[in-house]
């Protein structure tokens, strides 16, 4: 039966990895795999266990209890992501991200490279690397007319956005998972991973700035800055970003799960959105057509934002996290971790392999698996290194991260072009940051 379980999981995993080749959304194999695995466990009356992290051993449990336990842990992540996604969509409803374009005052390609890289690094730490990439590539399309130049910039945005997401508990779904699961605290994650992430960003940008693609000036007119469609755009941008940043502080003060703070932040942002939208503003360009408002129904910014949420991503996370939970409940991951430690005693090598692996396969199941494999306590450096490796390793292939996939779609970036031109920069940045992390850990933070 163990062989059947492993085959089903690997088949589902392969389908997720090959979603672009198979042309099916990865949520389909994730949900199917999850349901089939738990059905087999139930029908075959297989023994399920809960990992006792303190004693580092497996304790027998009942399927109803263990499934409810894992559903609760997964729901914490999903509700948190729903709140964050809605806040970002509310900012977009008021065209708040157009404010960022106003910061761009230079035509120098090299200065623009640094500007976009720093913006990607900071933005992704707040609104996550996927959303930051969408926002910056959209701005890129308005600022740079030459497509070949845009490809280079988009490639660098992928690297820097992923680096920016790795050090923040709200910057990447994998760091969010580790944070919500009480593997890392926000402060210690920042202390351990911020400097390696900066190295991971700066090294590739320094190397790329010597390329011909980033020499000279761009030809487009920077001065033709379009103001946000709403006068409340800048206010909603800063309010929304501030509300998301507030969540880690809320968790630290109250010791409540992060999704509670995110719901409070969403309520605050939504309140201001409703107040501002009552001033007859609508992002729709056809709002002046007589009778159009009534036809559209309730044009609430919250309703509109909720309708734009990336629900397939939420369902994918539900499927993959509960599928990995099935393997964890059977004790497979715990036993595999023991075998792995015997085969490769140096955990740093294991974690760096995780990082390289996250470029090939999705980093969400990788991190979910690592959480089931290792039982180290809160803020053990292992978890911080996993956060760094899984967050930044995906940059080595364009399909290795959500930021890469979305940039690939928006700019039609060729897989092999990225592999040839950008991948080595991502690898050098990843390796430099990893070395920096190990040196900091061994000689500065844990002397």
Description of each model-found segment:
Residues 4-5, 147, 151, 167-168, ...:
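Juxtamembrane and boundary regions of transmembrane helices in multi-pass small-molecule transporters
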Residues 6, 31-32, 78, 113-118, ...:
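Hydrophobic alpha-helical transmembrane segments
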Residues 38, 77, 81, 85, ...:
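Transmembrane alpha-helical segments of multi-pass membrane transport proteins and ion-pumping complexes
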Residues 72-81, 188-204, 254, 258-267, ...:
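Alpha-helical transmembrane segments
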């Amino acid at each position: 039966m163990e062989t059947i379980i492993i085959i089903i999981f690997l088949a589902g995993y392969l389908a997720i990895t090959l979603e672009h080749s198979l042309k099916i959304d990865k949520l389909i194999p994730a949900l199917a795999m999850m349901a089939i695995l738990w059905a087999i466990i139930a029908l075959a009356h297989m023994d399920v266990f809960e990992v006792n992290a303190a004693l580092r051993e497996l304790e027998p449990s009942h399927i109803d209890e263990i499934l409810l336990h894992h559903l609760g842990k997964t729901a914490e992540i999903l509700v948190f992501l729903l709140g964050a996604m809605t806040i970002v969509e509310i900012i977009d409803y008021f065209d708040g991200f157009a404010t960022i374009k106003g910061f761009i005052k230079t035509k120098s390609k090299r200065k623009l490279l640094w500007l976009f890289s720093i913006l990607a690094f900071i933005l992704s730490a707040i609104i996550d690397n996927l959303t930051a990439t969408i926002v910056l590539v959209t701005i890129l399309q308005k600022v740079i007319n030459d497509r070949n130049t845009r490809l280079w910039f988009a490639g660098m945005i992928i690297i820097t956005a992923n680096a920016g997401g790795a050090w923040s508990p709200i910057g990447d779904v994998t760091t969010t998972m580790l944070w919500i699961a009480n593997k890392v605290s926000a402060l210690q994650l920042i202390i351990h991973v911020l400097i390696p992430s900066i190295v991971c960003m700066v090294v590739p940008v320094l190397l790329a700035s010597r390329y011909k693609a980033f020499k000279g000036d761009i030809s487009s007119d920077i001065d033709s800055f379009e103001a946000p469609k709403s006068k409340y755009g800048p206010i909603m941008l800063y309010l929304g970003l501030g509300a998301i940043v507030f969540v880690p502080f809320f968790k630290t003060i109250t010791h409540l799960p992060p999704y509670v703070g995110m719901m409070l932040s969403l309520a605050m942002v939504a309140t201001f959105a409703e107040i501002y939208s009552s001033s007859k503003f609508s992002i729709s360009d056809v709002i002046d057509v007589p009778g159009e408002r009534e036809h559209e129904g309730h044009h609430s910014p919250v309703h509109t934002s909720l309708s734009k949420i990336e629900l397939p991503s939420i369902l994918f996370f539900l499927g993959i996290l509960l599928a990995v939970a099935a393997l964890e409940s059977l004790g497979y991951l715990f036993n595999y971790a023991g075998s792995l430690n015997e085969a490769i005693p140096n955990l740093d090598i294991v974690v760096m392999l995780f990082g390289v692996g996250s470029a090939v396969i999705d980093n969400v199941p990788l991190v979910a698996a690592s959480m089931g494999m290792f039982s180290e306590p809160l803020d053990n450096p292992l978890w911080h290194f996993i956060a760094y490796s899984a967050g930044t390793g995906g940059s080595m292939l364009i399909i290795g991260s959500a930021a890469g996939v979305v940039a690939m779609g928006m700019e039609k970036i060729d897989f092999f072009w990225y592999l040839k031109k950008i991948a080595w920069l991502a690898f050098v940045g990843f390796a430099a940051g990893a070395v920096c992390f190990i040196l900091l850990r061994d000689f500065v933070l844990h002397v």
